[in-house]
Swiss-Prot record:
The gene is CYN. The active site is at residues 121, 124, 147. SUPFAM superfamilies: Cyanase C-terminal domain, lambda repressor-like DNA-binding domains. Catalyzes the reaction of cyanate with bicarbonate to produce ammonia and carbon dioxide. The keyword Lyase applies. It catalyses: cyanate + hydrogencarbonate + 3 H(+) = NH4(+) + 2 CO2. Keywords: Lyase. Disulfide bonds: none annotated. It comes from Phaeodactylum tricornutum (strain CCAP 1055/1). InterPro entries: Cro/C1-type_HTH, Cyanase, Cyanate_lyase_C, Cyanate_lyase_C_sf, CYNS_N, Lambda_DNA-bd_dom_sf. This is Cyanate hydratase. Belongs to the cyanase family. Its EC number is 4.2.1.104. One of its GO terms (biological process) is cyanate metabolic process.
Amino acid sequence: MLSQLPRAAIRLLPRRQPNLHCYRYHSKPTSLTAQAGRVHRVLSAKADSNLTYDDLATCLGVTNTYAAQLLLGQAKLTPETAKKLRAALPAVSDDDLEDMQNSFPMRSYDDEILKEPHVYRTYEAITHYGEAMKAIINEQCGDGIMSAIDFYCDVGTSIGKHGEKRVVITFNGKFLPFIEQKAEDNGAMSPRD
C-alpha cells in the first residue's frame, strides 16, 4: 500500500514512532498511510485552486502557517473552519473534510525533514540565537518558557535596505512561568503516601 503513495506523501509518515500503526482516542481511527493519502489529495486540491497559503489564511481566518498545518494534517480542523475550507477548496472531498475534523493530527515530524535546507537553516537560526532569546525572555518575562501550544506563527516577507527580499517569521507564544512546587498546592495524591 505504501508503494502506491507519492514519494512526498510517504515522507509525511513519522519515523520516530515506527510501531505506531494508528492512533485512537475518542476519534475515528486513522492509519498513517490514510493520513498521507489524504494530505496528498488535499494538497492537490490546493494546487489545482491556485490559492496560496496566504490566500487560504485569509479565507479561513487563520495564520498562513496554521493553514499549511491544516492541509499537512498537523492541526485539527474545526467545524466552523471546515465550512470555510469547503468554500475555498471545493475539490476537497466530504470524506477528507470529515476525517480532518474527526481524527487527531500527527504533530510529530520525520527526522529527514532536518535535511531539507530551509528547515535546517531555520533550526540552525533557532539554535544559534536560542540562548540569547532565552536570556531576553527571562529578563522581560521571568523564569519560564514560551508555549508552543498557545502559539501563533506567521510567515511573511519584507524588503531589505538593499532592495532584497527578506523572510520574516513571527513566533507569538503565551509565556508560561515555572512555579515553585509547594506540596500544599499539589491536588494530586502523592505516590509516597
